[in-house]
A protein has these predicted regions:
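Short His-centered aromatic/hydrophobic patch
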Residues: 89-95, 115
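A conserved mid-protein helix/loop that constitutes part of the nucleotide-sugar donor-binding site
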Residues: 14-25, 192-211, 230-231, 312
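Conserved acidic donor-binding segment of nucleotide-sugar-dependent glycosyltransferases
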Residues: 289, 304-311, 320-325
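N-terminal strand-loop element at the rim of the active site
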Residues: 6-70, 224-227
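A conserved nucleotide-sugar
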Residues: 31-34, 202, 206-246, 323-326, ...
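Short hydrophobic beta-strand element within catalytic cores of glycosyltransferases
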Residues: 37-38, 286-289
Length: 361
């Protein structure tokens, strides 16, 4: 049995958070002790789901101040009391505070981290690079979720034997649905599943609605910082789209909502390996995504890519798919076939193999 602690800032909506909800029970069911430590333990649907699945969840605080220096002491105190074979971090604050806290603790715990994005604004700040290089050097293994993420991190910290790639995964069986048939003149429902954060490009999808007929409807699933949510809702009103766009917030019935949709979209400025893209591609609906790093590798050759930030190009490609039933069906089929390659069971097996390799090295 391996004792594993995963550490993440919170369980708000996001790809890394959703990965843990799917991954941790599988790691536990393989005969291991798998716990989770949150910097911000505020109650969320993801936290509730993990607790219902029997995962032990610890919290450092109930505040959204993950970079608070007090968290360094809190991590140190927690790791002093609890011993694990593997400590697996996610997100920058956790990646930094965990190795810092270990400096004064005599422990044999091996550190593993996952890079969940192909882009990080910190890497443009030259004065942070020495700290980042020290931080990454403390890890026995650094998991990148895609080829672009791997290349970008290799360029930043230099080539290292500790860098590997393990793709994210989802429970594809929960999302696989029969491919839908589009009927002439029917209402078309477009769905985008993404946290309302700066890296996502909801603005372009909203503006694309201005180029689509009135029978096209749009729904956003996800939440985020209140100021960003408010900004997008204000833009929706300014564009006169309030009667055609629905902000649905965080939902636990995403697979059912995708089943009722006709086209799934992900508009983003950058991505790692998006779990919502895998879910969307598994749903039996054509998947249309921004032509950006992370999505390009995932969607290219299966779904449809549109020019980053080009609302007219997005609208044209959505409408073309819906007006050409044969192509609609072919794209949906290709998307489902691609999604099956990213089942969470495959991801779990690769992480378990990695843990054994790290402990035996």
């Amino acid at each position: 049995m391996i004792k594993v602690l995963h550490v993440i800032t919170s369980l708000y909506t996001g790809g890394a958070e959703r990965l843990l909800v799917n991954l941790l029970p599988l790691l536990r069911d393989s005969g291991n002790q798998v716990d989770l430590l949150l910097f911000n333990g505020i109650e969320t649907p993801f936290k509730k789901e993990l607790l219902q699945k029997g995962i032990k969840v610890y919290s450092l605080s109930m505040k959204n101040d993950v970079y608070n220096p007090c968290n360094l002491y809190r991590v140190w105190w927690f790791l002093k009391k609890h011993r694990y074979d593997i400590i697996h971090t996610h997100n920058t604050a956790c990646q930094l505070f965990v190795p810092l806290s270990q400096i004064s603790i005599r422990t044999e715990s091996k550190l593993v981290t996952t890079e969940h994005s192909s882009f990080n604004r910190r890497r443009s700040m030259w004065w942070i690079k020495p700290l980042d290089k020290w931080m990454y050097n403390r890890y026995a293994s650094i998991v990148c979720i895609g080829d672009k993420s791997y290349r970008n991190l290799s360029t930043y910290i230099g080539k290292s034997d500790s860098l590997i790639t393990i793709s994210n995964g989802v429970d594809t069986g929960s999302f696989i649905r029969p491919i839908k048939q589009i009927l002439p003149g029917q209402q078309i429902v477009i769905t985008m599943v993404a946290a309302l954060r700066v890296e996502k490009d909801h603005r372009t999808v909203l503006k694309a609605m201005l180029h689509l007929p009135d029978n096209y409807r749009l729904q956003f699933i996800g939440s985020g910082p209140q100021e960003h949510v408010t900004s997008m809702k204000c833009l929706c009103s300014e564009l006169g789209l309030d009667d055609r766009v629905t902000f649905m917030g965080v939902r636990q019935d995403v697979s059912d909502i995708l089943e009722q949709s006709d086209v799934v979209v992900l508009s983003s400025h950058w991505e790692g390996l998006s779990l919502s893209s895998i879910e969307g591609m598994a749903s039996g609906r054509p998947f249309v995504a921004s032509d950006v790093d992370g999505l390009r590798e995932m969607v290219g050759g299966s779904g449809v890519l549109f020019e980053h930030g080009n609302d007219k190009d997005l609208a044209e490609k959505i409408q073309w798919l819906c007006e050409h039933p044969d192509e609609y069906r072919k794209v949906a089929q290709r998307c489902q076939e691609k999604a099956r390659q990213y089942d969470i069971s495959i991801t779990a097996e690769k992480y378990l193999d990695l843990y054994h390799q790290v402990l035996n090295s």
